[in-house]
Amino acid sequence: EQYPFLKSHVIDGKAVLPMAVMIEWMAHGAIHNNPGLRFHGFNDLRVLKGVTLEHGQSHTLQVMTGKSFKSGGVHVVPVELSGVAANGKQFVHCRARIVLAAKLPEGKVAMERVELQAYSRPIEEVYQPDRLFHGPDFHGIREVIGCSADGIASMVRPAPLPTDWIKQPLRNSWLSDPLALDSSFQLMILWSFERYKSASLPVFAGRYRQYLERFPESGAEIRIRVTNQSASKAAAEIDFVDPGSGALIARI
């Protein structure tokens, strides 16, 4: 009840904490212990054990931060999202090195869309059990611009206010945009179905850099270039682009 967004992220009858929300909470932990710095991104984020909840179940999570260190003009904070097992032992759900900066650098030039063909489904059929499991809170994809063996592109909605998803949020505004980030992972699922007839779920992100303190309120364009692929896994570069100015908002 405290986290109503979880009702829209259910797999096999269990609520699953989205990786995009893990990112938000870990970034908040890093910022909280390093006041005055801004969230710039992360390195080497890996989900080791997903956070799942059955109906009526609760689970205690802790964000653990290490000592920050400077590297290449930014501040790097080791962060872990941990839980407690039934035997009382603590274990790690997710870890990353959160990157903070005194001032966000100017964004790079956004990559061009890869060559795309028309997507095979109308947008009304994207959020169906045979494609995307996501409920209403995570219906972030407005339009699939196109899809091909090399990638996919889409227009996505912005996240609502944190209070729409969480009864007592840690902040009154997002550090990133969890709906935009989650939508990029959704697009990889759609791409995987088109290419290999199966879904892919995110477990690792090597590098994320954000060049604006906040995502545009109008939403974003997502451009994905698949760099490595097989029937069992795929790797991609993902750009979040301001559809109005063409500026690069963020890059995975």
Predicted region positions:
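Acyl-thioester-processing domains in fatty-acid/polyketide/NRPS systems
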Residues: 1-252
